[in-house]
Amino acid sequence: MKMTPAKALALFACACSSSAFAQETKNNSTSGTKPRALARIVWQDSSDPTLKWSDVTRGSDGLSIQPQAVAGFPKLDGEKQSFVQMEDSNGIVVVGIHDNDNGQFQSGWVALSSGVTEEEHGDHSHWHFDQPPSILASKLDQEQGNPAHVYNYQGDIFLANDKKNGFTLLTAAALSKANATTTADSLARFYAGGGGHITLAAVDRQVCYATWMDRDGENQGRVDVIPLDINSPGKGYSLKLPSGGLHGATANSGRIFFAPSDGIDWVEADVGLKQRPDSVKINHLSLGQDTATGKPLRTGAFTNHGSHVLFTTGTKDSATLCIIDAKSSEPVVNKISMPIEEGLAWTTPACVRTATGKQYAFIFGDRRDSEVAESLSIVDLDPNADGNFSDAKVSKKLGVGPSKIVGHGGHHEVAFSASGRWAFIANPGDGTIWAISLSSLEVDSKTKVGGTPSRMVVVGG
């Protein structure tokens, strides 16, 4: 195959970079200088529960992770409180906190700076790890409604306040200016909308769709459409989807996707709130039927990757990875068969575009009341690189350490470096974090960090 000058130059630059890095590593090991940080990981340790962090460095002995507690993180009661989801917005991490008393003990959120800064250089960035993580603000009391789901839409962080039938918005603008003197109230804004176990989908910082989980009654299939402009209170409306039990919502390419008890429903995003409940066209995508129960197949969570929406459904031989091209004129469900052993269930996909342009979905086979060996499947989403994911297929399957599932927590987790060179996976059951090279898809290192590492974010790298 003929090599173009551009490709030859890229390969030469890569070789020079690798050679320089190898020499730097050698110099570090002989001179005693501090190893260069490749990325920073922040993770939840549910054994305490505490928030931990470490820079990932490479020395003569390979990758190194040295766990430390985040200084100033509020002390949680492990018997009464637990972590829920967390999100990163340009280096600021927001962590949700749940309690076991319907929010009447202390629930809410904590915002912290990762301590990592980005120096952009056109087609790449340099990352600086000069400061440790620091707490910016927190809100833990009896008024936060026991959040469970945390989302990042366009850099804004949304927390679903289940017991208050509403959600909290922490805007990207406010987060970007946050510092040690920031007050929680200056960051957060509450909106009424949604009910029960709420899921959220927001578009263009203008509108948010908030679901109700009711399976019957007057709120079955209800979705509240809420304006985010504080100058437009009371101008929203409510939709009614064909089926209830809503658990899952996302926004992609100007469309909103929902996960009810039957398949997938979607609507065009009403950013200007110009429609009425009876004028909204509700579109339905069937996922088929569960062969064991005869009930319609469903999902419980979505992942966005570019203009694609990914999720899993089914069990055992009928287990499937589903992909929807959200920008298509007529969205359909592209199904990739992924049979799974009895006693395991696929997790929600986590997606990455690597430094070389490959696109992968990482999906764990986690235990469901069984002792079956767990695994990680890595799906090549676009083997022929034509932008169409219809040829997606499992590229690699790896054994992993054990999970330690309690409620919604304790699943395997994965997060990726910003450069698309590394994946880091947490094995809650044996207290390890593994690093996987995204060029070889092989495990590069396994580090015992102790405790029960679970949800994580990676900043920089």
Positions of the model-derived regions?
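Structural motif
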Residues: 49-55, 102-112, 164-172, 217-224, ...
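Repeated scaffold domains used in trafficking and secretory/extracellular systems
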Residues: 28-32, 75-90, 134-153, 189-205, ...
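Short coil/turn segments that connect the beta-strands within blades of beta-propeller domains
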Residues: 37-39, 90-92, 154-156, 205-206, ...
